[in-house]
Amino acid sequence: MLMPKRVKYRREHRGKMRGRAKGGTEVAFGEFGLQAQAASWITNRQIEAARRAMTRYMKRGGKVWIKIFPSKPYTAKPLEVRMGSGKGAPEGWVAVVKPGKIMFEIAGVSEEVAREALRLAAHKLPVKCKFVKREENGGESNEN
């Protein structure tokens, strides 16, 4: 599972997910990418499930880049505990994803294989996604 090696503080504020992604909105490493269409928290378990679905479909061929990292801790209180008495214990790690962010990239496989692998990965994620291709001039084409 992905998680930071060490953090300065064990607990963080939840924050707001306003606006679009500032960086990472173009296919940089691979040929095809999976782009988020909405804002969401994506847990380290969801990232791992999506990665497994992609690599299993591609039969270990090609290369996969994971462009998001779960660096934000989220907390939860135990069941049947009354309100108050402090913030809950750290429960897991999430990556904050905003609209436009490329989450996964693939290279070394055909477009049909990449499209299906990224479709399987998108089903593991709690956010609506779009398949994008790298353009020759450096950007990506927004074809669905």
From Swiss-Prot:
Which UniProt keywords are present, listed alphabetically? Ribonucleoprotein, Ribosomal protein, RNA-binding, rRNA-binding, tRNA-binding
Question: What is the native source organism of this protein?
Answer: Bacillus cereus (strain AH187)
List GO terms (cellular component aspect): cytosolic large ribosomal subunit
- UniProt xrefs under Gene3D superfamilies: Ribosomal protein L10e/L16
- Oligomeric form and interacting partners: Part of the 50S ribosomal subunit.
| Pfam families, alphabetized | Ribosomal_L16
**PROSITE patterns referenced in this protein's UniProt entry, alphabetically:** RIBOSOMAL_L16_1, RIBOSOMAL_L16_2
CDD domains cross-referenced by the UniProt entry: Ribosomal_L16_L10e
User: Which PANTHER family is this protein grouped with?
Assistant: 50S/60S RIBOSOMAL PROTEIN L16 (PTHR12220), LARGE RIBOSOMAL SUBUNIT PROTEIN UL16M (PTHR12220:SF13)
- List, alphabetically, the InterPro entries matched: Ribosomal_uL16 (IPR047873), Ribosomal_uL16_bact-type (IPR000114), Ribosomal_uL16_CS (IPR020798), Ribosomal_uL16_dom (IPR016180), Ribosomal_uL16_sf (IPR036920)
State the protein's purpose: Binds 23S rRNA and is also seen to make contacts with the A and possibly P site tRNAs.
Similarity annotation: Belongs to the universal ribosomal protein uL16 family.
Please give the HAMAP family that the UniProt record associates with this protein.
Ribosomal_uL16 (MF_01342)
Is Nuclease among the key words of this record? no
Could you give a GO molecular-function term held by this entry? structural constituent of ribosome
One biological-process term from Gene Ontology? translation
Highest taxon above the source species: Bacteria
Instruction: Output this protein's name.
Output: Large ribosomal subunit protein uL16
Which stretches are annotated as coiled coil?
none
